[in-house]
C-alpha cells in the first residue's frame, strides 16, 4: 500500500512544480505586498464565506446581499492582480478536478460512472 502513498507524494511534488501552481503562488505573493489588493481580496472572500454560511444554514440571501456580492465581485475583477489570481485559481481547479477524475477512475469499475 505504501506504493500508493509514494505516488501521492510524487503527484504532490508535480503539482507544486506545475506552472499553474507557480503562477498562483506568485500572484498571492504580489497581492500580499499590495495593501489595497490584499484588503479588497480579504473583504471579498469574507463576504463569500458569510453568504455560503447563510446558505448552509438554510437562510435566504436577501436581494441587498446579492447586489452587494455582485458589486464586490465587479470591484475585485477590476483589480488586475486579483483578476489574474482568480483566473489562475480556476486553472488550478481544473487541473485538480482532472486529477481527481483520473484517480477515481478505478472506482467506476465498481460503482459505475455517476455522470452517465
UniProtKB/Swiss-Prot annotation:
Gene3D superfamilies reported in the protein's UniProt record: YheA/YmcA-like (1.20.1500.10)
Highest taxon of source: Bacteria
InterPro entries: Com_YlbF, YheA/YmcA-like_dom_sf
SUPFAM superfamilies in alphabetical order: YheA/YmcA-like
Family: Belongs to the UPF0342 family.
Name used for this protein in its record: UPF0342 protein BH1149
